[in-house]
From Swiss-Prot:
Highest taxon of source: Eukaryota
Record's protein name: Metallothionein-4
UniProt-annotated binding residues for a divalent metal cation 2: C8, C14, C16, C27
UniProt: a divalent metal cation 1 binding residues: C6, C8, C22, C25
Residues given in the record as a divalent metal cation 7 binding sites: C51, C58, C60, C61
Family note: Belongs to the metallothionein superfamily. Type 1 family.
GO cellular component: cytosol
UniProt xrefs under Pfam families: Metallothio (PF00131)
Role of this protein: Seems to bind zinc and copper. Could play a special role in regulating zinc metabolism during the differentiation of stratified epithelia.
BP-aspect Gene Ontology terms: intracellular monoatomic cation homeostasis; response to cadmium ion
Length: 62
């Protein structure tokens, strides 16, 4: 499967795993993978967030 595509658009469990790069993915398990700069413990990370500061800080997390 192309890592840019995701078959899970309605939430729930997903087969994309850590390779999910899709911005329209609704899978709970893909949320962090779609924002690589988000710290592992951040619960506020959202899909489509912006990485700033050299991709080491997420716009959704403090």
């Amino acid at each position: 499967m192309d890592p840019g595509e995701c078959t899970c658009m309605s939430g729930g469990i997903c087969i994309c795993g850590d390779n999910c790069k899709c911005t329209t993915c609704s899978c709970k398990t893909c949320r962090k993978s779609c924002c690589p700069c988000c710290p592992p413990g951040c619960a506020k990370c959202a899909r489509g967030c912006i990485c700033k500061g050299g991709s080491d800080k997420c716009s959704c997390c403090p």
